[in-house]
């Protein structure tokens, strides 16, 4: 009975609970829908725009707008604001447009784009800003545009492209920078980070030198037309191994150096029309294995021996389009003829001449080395290595490379590099070879007395250009078509003597010469030092003589200006003269042996001496003055040295 009651209560509870749970779920769903509708707001099209496709496409063109209109539906995927008068894009203007994929702002008057102007556009893949007044690239505004694929900045007065200008949009695949006519500077790192870029337009940007495009490893199409660079040098397209289309039209190109296109292994289309090209280096297009479309028209081609290889190449690889590649401009009798119609029978051509042949070289291991091979610029250069490998400028080797001028460069030589290296120079009339022997020795320690770089005399038999011209006659052509001349012409070999494969050891004669040179240097040094010491001593002696002469002159001047000095010493013990003696000779005759001394004055008191203008000893016994002229002499100075013993009187 109890069990039956429990089962009845359980079924009753379930019957009541299930409707309550169902009603609660329905209420929650209804509330969520109301909240979503309230947050989305009403989907109304702005009055100045036209909307279609359930508000996913909004067009507001040519409405004279000065700012982005309010109330753009949140589900908009395509927004066109072109041809208005918008001058500034403020931050968070499009924050609510999370589904926007295409934003067209071209042909406005936009001068400033604030940082954060495109916040919220997580789905944006195309941004058009062409034909505006931007002077700088708004790099800060591109933040968080993680899905951006296309960016159009064409025809803006942008003056420079700084480093890392687009590193915030690594997803970019198409970048249009054409017609930047105010552009003056492109940084070396301007395109860093754009490893996904497929298309780049730099046409009509007043570019004078090819910018650094190495970071664009995935680039497939490059537009460079309408610029002003007269030369295309090797390395201009370095790193663009994926490039398929290259347009360089109307850029005043007058010279393309050999090996200029060596890195473009994937190139399919090349347009060089409307330039100033008159000739091209031999085998310029040989590395372009996939090239099928070539445009060379509207160039002043000079149809001579340097153009024969191009005529043959056009017939072989582009036989279906004879008008693609222009006509002869010179000489006069060839003017107007298509390049593919130029025949070698009309010219007298000779094999190339090697102007600077390589020389034998002895060098130690782990050093850098070069073997030069200077040739005419319109010829092609290849090197034959000792192991049979043929190396050109386009070849890739870890340590050995062919430079633009034909030089074979070793970044680091090893013992296995020892052998004969042959420079092979080719043009349409034939080829010329020159060989050199490279001897690599093992590096030895503790050898400071001599260098591994030794001069080796090489006897080279050179052939003059006249002999080559006389020896080589035009290669006959068959009726079936032109054949490459280097398959039938004779090789011109410049013989060079080989150096035995011994390690260079310093000889006794070399050591003696080095010692003699050292002795001569020491002698010269000693002579210079001796001359310096002699000049110094001579100057010192002259200075001493001058000093002595000057001192003697000063002493003579002092003696001349001095007067006589009289020193009188008087002994105080001499007795005074008797009065009788003074009167004993009135007639002036003195007594026997009598000495008459002057009266000694009291020198202690100067005033007692001063009144005596005439000394009494100046008169004789007759009363006549012995010195009548000395009556106005000033009184002498009195110097007392001792008051009791001696008195010194000095008259100056």
Swiss-Prot record:
It comes from the Eukaryota. Specifically expressed in brain. In the hippocampus, parietal cortex and piriform cortex expressed in proximal segments of CA1 pyramidal neurons. Residues 299-351 form the LRRCT domain. LRR repeats lie at residues 75-96, 99-120, 123-144, 147-168, 171-193, 196-217, 218-239, 242-263, 266-287. The keyword Cell membrane applies. GO terms for cellular component: dendritic spine; excitatory synapse; glutamatergic synapse; neuron spine; postsynaptic density membrane; postsynaptic membrane; Schaffer collateral - CA1 synapse; synapse. Its main location: membrane. Disruption phenotype: Mutant mice dysplay impaired startle response to acoustic stimulus. Residues 41-526 are extracellular. Glycans are attached at residues 276, 321, 362, 387, 409, 433, 439, 449. Residues 1-40 form the signal peptide. Residues 352-441 form the Ig-like domain. The keyword Signal applies. N-glycosylated. The chain crosses the membrane at residues 527-547. Keywords: Cell membrane, Disulfide bond, Glycoprotein, Immunoglobulin domain, Leucine-rich repeat, Membrane, Postsynaptic cell membrane, Repeat, Signal, Synapse, Transmembrane, Transmembrane helix. Residues 41-74 form the LRRNT domain. Synaptic adhesion protein. Regulates the formation of exitatory synapses through the recruitment of pre-and-postsynaptic proteins. Organize the lamina/pathway-specific differentiation of dendrites. Plays an important role for auditory synaptic responses. Involved in the suppression of glioma. This is Leucine-rich repeat-containing protein 4. It comes from Mus musculus (Mouse).
């Amino acid at each position: 009975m109890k069990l039956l009651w429990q089962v009845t209560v359980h079924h009753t509870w379930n019957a009541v609970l299930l409707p309550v749970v169902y009603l609660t779920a329905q209420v929650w769903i209804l509330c969520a829908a109301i909240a979503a509708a309230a947050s989305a707001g009403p989907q109304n099209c702005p009055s100045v725009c036209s909307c279609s496709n359930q508000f996913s496409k909004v067009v507001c063109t040519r409405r004279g707008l000065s700012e982005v209109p309010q109330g753009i539906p949140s589900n908009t995927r395509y927004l066109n604001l072109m041809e208005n008068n918008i001058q500034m894009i403020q931050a968070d203007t499009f924050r609510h447009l999370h589904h926007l994929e295409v934003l067209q702002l071209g042909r406005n008057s936009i001068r400033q784009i604030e940082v954060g102007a495109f916040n919220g556009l997580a789905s944006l893949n195309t941004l058009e800003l062409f034909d505006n007044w931007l002077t700088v690239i708004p790099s800060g505004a591109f933040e968080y545009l993680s899905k951006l694929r296309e960016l159009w900045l064409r025809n803006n007065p942008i003056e420079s492209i700084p480093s890392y200008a687009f590193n915030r949009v690594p997803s970019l695949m198409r970048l249009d920078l054409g017609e930047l006519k105010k552009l003056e500077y492109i940084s070396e790192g301007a395109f860093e980070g754009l490893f996904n870029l497929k298309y780049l337009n730099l046409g009509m940007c007043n570019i004078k030198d090819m910018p650094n495009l190495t970071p664009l490893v995935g680039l497939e199409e490059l537009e460079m037309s309408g610029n002003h660079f007269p030369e295309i040098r090797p390395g201009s397209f370095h790193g663009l191994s994926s490039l398929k289309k290259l347009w360089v039209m109307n850029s005043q190109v007058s010279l393309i150096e050999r090996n200029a296109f060596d890195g473009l292994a994937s190139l399919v289309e090349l347009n060089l029309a409307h330039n100033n090209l008159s000739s091209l280096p031999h085998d310029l297009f040989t590395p372009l294995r996939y090239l099928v479309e070539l445009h060379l028209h509207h160039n002043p081609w000079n149809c001579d021996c340097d153009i024969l290889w191009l005529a043959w190449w056009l017939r072989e690889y582009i036989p279906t389009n004879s008008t693609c590649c222009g006509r002869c401009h010179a000489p006069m009798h060839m003017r107007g003829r298509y390049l593919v119609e130029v025949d070698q029978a009309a010219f007298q051509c000779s094999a190339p001449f090697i102007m600077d042949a390589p020389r034998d070289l002895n060098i130690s291991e782990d050093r850098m080395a070069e073997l030069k091979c200077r040739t005419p610029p319109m010829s092609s250069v290849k090197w034959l290595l000792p192991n049979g490998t043929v190396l050109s400028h386009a070849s890739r080797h870890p340590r050995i490379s062919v430079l633009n001028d034909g030089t074979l460069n070793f970044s680091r030589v090893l013992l296995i590099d020892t052998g004969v290296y042959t420079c092979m120079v080719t043009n349409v009339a034939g080829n010329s070879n020159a060989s050199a022997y490279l001897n690599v020795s093992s590096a030895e320690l503790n050898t400071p007395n001599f260098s591994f770089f030794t001069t080796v005399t090489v006897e080279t038999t050179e052939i003059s250009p006249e002999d080559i011209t006389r020896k080589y006659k035009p290669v006959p052509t068959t009726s079936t078509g032109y054949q490459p001349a280097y398959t039938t012409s004779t090789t011109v070999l410049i013989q060079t003597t080989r150096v035995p494969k011994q390690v260079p050891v310093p000889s006794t004669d070399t050591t003696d010469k080095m010692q003699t040179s050292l002795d001569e240097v020491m002698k010269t040094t000693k002579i210079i030092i001796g001359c310096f010491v002699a000049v110094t001593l001579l100057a010192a002696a002259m200075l001493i003589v001058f000093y002595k002469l000057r001192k003697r002159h000063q002493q003579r001047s002092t003696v001349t200006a001095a007067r006589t000095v009289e020193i009188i010493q008087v002994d105080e013990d001499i007795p005074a003269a008797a009065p009788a003696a003074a009167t004993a000779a009135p007639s002036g005759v003195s007594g026997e042996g009598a000495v008459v001394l002057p009266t000694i004055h009291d020198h202690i008191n100067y005033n007692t001496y001063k009144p005596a203008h005439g000394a009494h000893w100046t008169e004789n016994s007759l009363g006549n003055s012995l010195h009548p002229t000395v009556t106005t002499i000033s009184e002498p100075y009195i110097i007392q040295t001792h008051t009791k013993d001696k008195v010194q009187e000095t008259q100056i």
